[in-house]
Regions:
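Assembly/oligomerization scaffold segments
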Residues: 1-88, 249
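Acidic, small/polar-enriched beta strand-loop surface segments
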Residues: 1-4, 45, 154-156, 163-290, ...
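A structural signal for the main folded, soluble domain(s) of proteins
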Residues: 34, 38, 47-52, 76, ...
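Amphipathic, non-transmembrane alpha-helical segments in extracytoplasmic/periplasmic proteins
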Residues: 34, 93-117, 132-156, 263
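Extended Gly/Ser/Thr-rich low-complexity repeat segments
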Residues: 44-55, 89-99, 177, 264-269
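Well-ordered beta-strand positions in beta-sheet-rich domains
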Residues: 64, 78, 93, 251, ...
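Short, solvent-exposed secondary-structure boundary/capping segments
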Residues: 70-83, 91, 286-299
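Short beta-strand-centered interaction patches in the first periplasmic/extracellular domains
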Residues: 76, 83-84, 118-192
């Protein structure tokens, strides 16, 4: 296990009491929570917000994290670092007129000093007009991702927008066996909470998307700034996918699994109702305990 602070390996210079990394997607920033002993040493380094820190274990890396908060606790320090620097969370008022998604990604990345990437989503999507009101770069991109049926992931100084449908079609990189009496495995299926229909309604257009896999009759109307039917239809499908994929979840505990990270495709086997195709939604790695916990969401292909 290695702890790197501002490019220097300080593993031997501190006493690590606990270290938990939360690897997330969908608007949640990856985070690293540390408790370090020997507080006097930490003071001597004069830590500042946005100092860079990362941890590695057995091939897994948190990627570069940015120091967010330091809280002294009886001779120890509780330290929180996130994958977003302060600039990515700074709110602003801006407008974006006749710009493509890749242009907006580039502008936001430059504003907060990060790199950017699109995966499984068309960077040529053009927006006639977008308004950003008291919204951070990360919040704006997360809002766009939700409308486009994508998630925003921040890792190692990079903003990445990942198309959910494309990722669901990818080959599984992990097979997880879950049995009926497996300790720590929790399968939650709230199928009745899936929307049957989501409508995008604006003064200019109204278009609905439907989920053929929903068992209830719930519907919802949202009002994003669509001005044409093509955009409204795409957003209705994207919003419905992002909403309904959260209805069925599976949580699994394991020994430390360096290969587990958010948005990877996994197949679940074991002869239970959880069998099938899933996407990793959030992973928690406990470096000191040597354990990992993954929360997965079921892949759905019934939106139209």
């Amino acid at each position: 296990m290695e702890l790197i602070y501002e490019g220097v390996d300080i593993t031997k210079d501190v006493r690590i009491v606990s270290a938990v990394c939360r690897d997330a997607s969908g608007g949640k920033s990856d985070s690293l929570e540390l408790v370090l002993g020997d507080a006097e040493k930490w003071y001597s380094w004069k830590p500042q917000q946005d100092d860079k820190i990362l941890m590695r274990r057995e091939g897994y890396s948190t990627g570069t994290m940015y120091l967010s908060a330091v809280q002294p606790e009886e001779g120890e320090f509780r330290i929180l670092a996130t994958a977003q620097p302060m600039a990515a969370r700074r709110k602003a008022n801006k407008s974006y007129e006749d710009m493509t998604l890749e242009t907006i990604m580039g502008l936001c990345a430059a504003e907060c000093g990060m790199r950017w990437r699109l995966h499984g989503i068309d960077g040529g999507i053009r927006y006639r007009y977008l308004l950003r009101t008291e919204e951070s770069c990360a919040a704006l991109l997360d809002r766009l991702a939700g409308m486009e049926g994508a998630v925003l992931k921040c890792w190692d100084g990079q903003l990445t927008m990942i198309g959910i449908a494309k990722q669901q079609e990818a080959a599984a990189v992990e097979t997880i066996r879950v049995t009926a009496r497996q300790p720590g495995a929790v399968h939650t299926d709230r199928a009745r909470e899936r929307l049957r229909q989501l409508t995008v309604a604006t003064p200019w257009v109204q278009v609905s998307a439907r989920d053929a896999g929903g068992s209830g009759e719930l519907s919802e109307t949202q009002t994003p700034p669509a001005t044409d039917a093509a955009t409204a239809g795409r957003w209705a499908r994207g919003l419905l996918l992002c909403r309904n994929r959260q209805a069925e979840k599976l949580t699994v505990h394991s020994r430390f699994r360096a290969e587990w990270t958010a948005m990877l495709r996994a197949d679940v086997t074991g002869g239970t109702a959880a069998d099938g195709k899933w996407l990793m939604d959030e992973v928690e790695h406990d470096f000191m305990a040597g354990t990992s916990r993954v929360t997965l969401v079921r892949c759905i292909d019934t939106i139209g």
